[in-house]
A protein has these predicted regions:
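A short beta-strand-loop structural module common to alpha/beta enzyme folds
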Residues: 3-15
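FMN-binding flavodoxin-like domain, especially the glycine-rich phosphate-binding loop
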Residues: 4-7, 21-143
Length: 143
């Protein structure tokens, strides 16, 4: 996507003024424990909910472990989606579940992941290809 390093914002440092600057938000998180959201995100969600997201595209991505936590694979992406779906943002970057091995995930809505799930533990050989395909998809969806 050609995002400069200066535009990468740590969620723990994010504020409403930063969010206002962008038309597209790429929001990433890892899934912790048994399907939990990374702690920093709870305050980040509060910041985002105070912003007008109605004219913004939001693309979600996250990391998980499809083997050890197959029943909560990348659930944190699903938590972000659930928290933001009433903000009227335009979600983009949904990914087909084909090619992923897992039992359950709240990040799957209508048969697709609501964002890009990555598994660097068990499927690291597919990460680069998945990211490239997702970036192209997001570019098309926001153009």
């Amino acid at each position: 996507l050609g995002v400069p390093a200066s535009d990468v914002i740590d969620v723990s440092k994010m504020n409403a003024d930063m969010v206002k600057e962008y038309e597209v938000l790429l929001l990433g998180t890892s899934t912790w424990g048994d399907g939990e959201l990374q702690d920093d995100w709870y305050d980040g969600i509060k910041v985002l909910k105070k912003c007008d997201l109605s004219h913004k595209y939001v693309a979600l991505f996250g990391c998980g472990d499809s083997d050890s936590y197959s029943d909560t694979f990348c659930d944190a992406i699903g938590i972000l989606y659930e928290e933001l779906k009433d903000t009227r943002c335009k979600f983009c970057g949904a990914v087909d579940t084909a090619g992923y091995t897992f039992d359950s995930s709240i990040a799957v809505v209508n048969g697709k992941f609501v964002g890009l799930p990555l598994d660097e533990v068990n499927e690291d050989g597919q990460t680069d290809e998945r990211i490239s395909a997702w970036v192209e998809q997001v570019k098309q969806e926001i153009s």
